[in-house]
Amino acid sequence: MQPPIAKKIPTERKSTYYQTVDDYAWLEDRTKSEPEVLDYLKAENAYMESVMAPTKELQEELYQEMRARIKEDDQEVPYRLGSYWYYRRTETDKQYPVYCRRKDKDDAPEEVLLDMNALAEGKKFISLGDYEVSDDGNWLAFTTDTLGFRQYDLHIKNLVTGETQDRIATRVDSVTWDSDNATLYYTQEDEVTKRTNLFFRIKRDGTDETLVYNEEDELYNIQCHKTRSGSYIVLVIESSTTTELHYKRVGLAGEFRVLFPRLEGREYMLDHRGEEFFIRINDAGKNFRVVSVVAEKPVLEEAQEKIAYRETVMIEDIDCFQDFFVVTERERGLIRYQVCSYSGERHSIEFQESVYSTSAGDNYEFATKLFRYHYESFITPDSTYDYDIETRTSTLLKQLPVLGGYTPKEYETVRVFAKASDDTEVPISLVYKRGALEGEP
């Protein structure tokens, strides 16, 4: 069987920054109903099936082998938000997860917020995008894609009655609640280019929709969120090299304010605590530094430096809590967490292995002494920890079980460096059976 060849229909594309000819623009059928496009996609699928046909048995064998090592009936570590513990669980032979919560009290019954398997009934596919609970815990804003084109519809569920108002907005990329529990903000992508460029305010019943912002520069996308403190709604406008942030106090009327004027090449992000914004910014160099400014009168020239710029350390993220903040850094290719007090003291979370991967976990609570993170390595399965900033200890909450007789102690992992021709040290991560190198010079 010969592979299908897409025909060429030259189409001129113009923008502020470029002009080009796209021979395959005709394939951008957003209605999913153009017969010629559908015929071509069917031909591509048929060709794939034909080429892969000899491997059918091997595909099934590999699938069953990998499935045998996965615990299908499982539950994630719950995280606290307000007066509830939220979690996601999976069930054997079910394709999609179930999202649940329990009240923060003994013997509280489980509340199912979203059963993705039930939502998928009658559909070939479903994907959950954003998932935001209102401050009072009574409303859930969530987005779903049922076609596989990553175009999400916004729905609102009443968590008291269980009723859902479907599709109050379309092509939604991000969503966040205002503090009145009745107003939402969301960003929307363009139907053709898929660039996220529109920012709306809307009531939870789908009424009173207002366009707040339209980003006209085609190089930029936008996204909205609320700070962990719950005090500010932030609109992030960014290209691959430049950031601009707009912000507004929750619950207050008025326009969004620009944090710093847009400047080509300047990137930054913010979090909030008290009267200050804590900002990760690259004004001193590509590796970023951390500064703070007065939230209601942010002037970069008057910023207080919290973490200085360093040539060998990349600052990747900052998370503010009520009594501490965490700076995520990368040095020599490895992530570490600097736990910082607002008085200036700081220390790192220690890891035992020399080769590992780590990422911040579900840290939604602002008033907490715990920092959650995920950790894994070549020999350590994905593990969830809570780090106590007072005792400086990490508590293992869950480790992903690996079925099939895997024993981590039978293996070793190390990290070595090799020098390139320009004397640059290149990290090399090794994993091997314990004892395999014994007797070697």
Stretch-by-stretch model annotation:
Residues 1-18:
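Charged, compositionally biased N-terminal leader segments and the immediate start
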